[in-house]
């Protein structure tokens, strides 16, 4: 049973129709009621099993149905994953997300996945996985291993969904989110802007997310990364203001959720990213690649953080952990005032 006011489609549509500056002002006010506006949660995403996915998501280069030039790779060894997690922590990430390109994990994969979760948790990092659909037993096993978050995006509205994916139903996605929640794992779920959807579809996606019995703790909003060989490779570019508007509406509708500026940042300039942060985005993926698509280099993100006076959320540093992490955090928390970018002047 819902424990929060339910949104209606007309209410969401009204938000999308608001003048942009009024919308941004409202979103920023709500954001400041629940979060420190200078804090950004930083995550790193690693593909632990790449390509050869049997599903037909039209945006995805990892689908075996499309010729994108992506070479399939087997599951990474546990120690390889843990080494990547160490590097992510040393670079400033507080959450380590792991994705596998399959429809759902098999039972024989579960001990491997549990071992990875336990190993990453032991470093003091939050853990997140995106593995496709889960059954009740798998969700509970991951919870028992210590998994903090599970990502399973809804992608778009229920009405537009069938134009993008046919190998998994919308209800199956909702069912997986329910199983994850019942197992005690926090939910990470969002969608993609630029699939060819209408504004009403964007409203419908956010309506589904906000009206879950408990809204997702983390809401990634992706800008479509067009990959040659996928059916959406020739889609029109997303207007930057339309994307910023979607971020702002997500913040207003889900005031206590982290809204993550996810895929597509590589094609955004600094001004667009700054306006997304003004609109209420307070989380990013950090690192040069998101699964298989480009992402801004770490140094570029650090420069942007310094210009905007943003600080990465503090990680839980274990006793005796290396000092590089602490030095990096101190560097990031010292704004470059000579080059400060005044986001409020946008």
From Swiss-Prot:
InterPro entries: Aldolase_TIM (IPR013785), BATS_dom (IPR010722), Biotin_synth/BioAB (IPR002684), Biotin_synthase (IPR024177), Elp3/MiaA/NifB-like_rSAM (IPR006638), rSAM (IPR007197). This is Biotin synthase. GO terms for biological process: biotin biosynthetic process. Its cofactor is [4Fe-4S] cluster; [2Fe-2S] cluster. Keywords: 2Fe-2S, 4Fe-4S, Biotin biosynthesis, Iron, Iron-sulfur, Metal-binding, S-adenosyl-L-methionine, Transferase. Coiled coil: none annotated. SUPFAM superfamilies: Radical SAM enzymes. One of its GO terms (molecular function) is iron ion binding.
